[in-house]
Amino acid sequence: MPKKFYVSWDNLQREARRLARRQLPVSQWKGIIAVSRGGLVPAALMARELGIRNVETLCISSYDHNNQRDLVVVKAATTAGDGEGWLVVEDLVDTGTTAKAIRELYPKAKFIAIFAKPMGEQLLDDFEVAIPQDTWIEQPWDMALEFATPICDEE
């Protein structure tokens, strides 16, 4: 079983804000391309921090929670053209398979992610947190808070 890295909502927002600060000035951006689904929340955070209201989606699928499978482009961000002036936002770049496809679709876009693993890191223009390749990231939207039984009541 791979190591796991758990991301809280607070941690995600803090890292997104740090990454957003490096994307200034805002005037250089026509909009954001949110990579669905993992990049939707980070893109919303970026849009808020940068004051960008033009948000497109690229619906691309290569994971079924824990399993990587064939890449499928469900919907492209057609108004973004070759990506010039656009900021592509993803939560994580892992092996680079999805990132390569995104680079082919939008070669002139700036491609950023909150988290990056070594195999995909070189495909990004910017990222905030380096994660070891053998570590699985659990994002806050995939988890739920639940009641923890007090130690004295565990028996």
Curated annotation (Swiss-Prot):
Pathway: Purine metabolism; GMP biosynthesis via salvage pathway; GMP from guanine: step 1/1; Purine metabolism; XMP biosynthesis via salvage pathway; XMP from xanthine: step 1/1. InterPro entries: PRibTrfase_dom, PRTase-like, Xanthine_Guanine_PRibTrfase. It is an enzyme of class 2 (transferase). GMP binds at residues 69, 94-98, 136-137. Keywords: Cell inner membrane, Cell membrane, Glycosyltransferase, Magnesium, Membrane, Metal-binding, Purine salvage, Transferase. Guanine binds at residues 94, 137. Pfam families: Pribosyltran. GO terms for molecular function: guanine phosphoribosyltransferase activity; hypoxanthine phosphoribosyltransferase activity; magnesium ion binding; xanthine phosphoribosyltransferase activity. It is a peripheral membrane protein. Belongs to the purine/pyrimidine phosphoribosyltransferase family. XGPT subfamily. This is Xanthine-guanine phosphoribosyltransferase.
